[in-house]
Amino acid sequence: GNYNVYPMPVESPNYGTRTLVANPDNANASPFGWHDTDGSAGAEYTITRGNNTHAFEDGDNQGYSPEGGAGLIFNFPINETYSNADQSEDAAITNLFYWNNIIHDVVYQYGFDEASGNFQENNYGNGGAGSDYVNAEAQDGSGTCNANMGTPGDGGNPTMQMYVCGSRDGDLDNGVIIHEYGHGISNRLTGGASAAGCLGNEEQMGEGWSDYYALMMTIEPADAGPDARPIGTWLTGSGPDGASIRT
């Protein structure tokens, strides 16, 4: 597939521009591509849906997913200033789909695979419980200026809800997307894949772990250890050097 997105390691429009990325799927983590579900060559879906995630709008056009056609070309115009009149939902949902898949493929290399309780519809015979791809809800209308990730035990679909904050669309803030996906990882790994409720107490490390994932996947070659790295600068509108959610 081809996806016009803010690609890894670009954290948000504050730090880079969109690029049309060709075939970014990893052959080890997603052996039949991002739009497969049956484990055979050829895509089952030509929308932003596949084995690892289904990205769709959950605002005023609930359930809508953009269409990439037979060539799986998801190349849509964007207005980075969100408004009800111009939501740029095709571009936003495409970015959300890309990042959910990229995160899946990266962490797969580090051991968050089927047997460890990762998020896939079809586990391709590699253990664990399937039927639990991520439902990634773009421009979700149930909240603002935030995001969340609900993670049941292995075999249950996680739900990622990405919100709008005024004129800023959280679906373009890749650091926030990664942070939320990180909650899914830590919820599945702490206590075991079937016991996803072990991080509900106040004294737990889930928020810090999720921030780490966001920092790791958006690090640039010139970054240095002492550098301040704020989280969520696009969503909150604080600017690239603003304090934002955390620094």
State each model region's role:
Residues G1-T247:
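Extracellular zinc-dependent metalloprotease catalytic-domain scaffold
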